[in-house]
Amino acid sequence: MHEIFKKLSNRMVGAMMIHTQLTELFNFIDLEADAKRQKKQLHEESDGLLKLEKYAAQHHHILITSDNPPQVDILNLDILERPNDKLSPDDKIHLIQYALKEWIEWEKKSKVIYEDSYRNLVDMSEIAAADFVLQYVKDVDKELRDAELLYRVRDAIDWDLATIYDKQARLSK
């Protein structure tokens, strides 16, 4: 069970890294509402990690530490070396698409890890622990659905920057 919790912990630390970097990226291209969404996800991941650590300690008497989180570096792009005001509209569209694709791929992989963890706990007859982990499965499933919907909505408007920025302004109020 310790290894299952450690795998979840490592993934959550990685999730905090990706949401931090997505927040930075969206702030860089002035997508304030998207940055706020990522910051909210960052806080939810942090809370989830603390709940996992508390659950493991109080219910299973084990201390879990993140010793091998995935290395996340989505900001390692040449385009980000330029000042924001030197980015073309196409550059910004590319960055938005890139960020959303990275987020979606991260959540897809997270969902597999969480579902496998749930399944392994059920197989071990650790039903209470599996039930605890099931909430993470549901959370990542919802986050994945939201990320995919955001991508589809923006794709449906053909990545029109004026519309995207207008909606950001309305959502940020």
Model-derived regions, located:
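Iron-associated oxidoreductase/ferritin-like identity signal
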Residues: 1-173
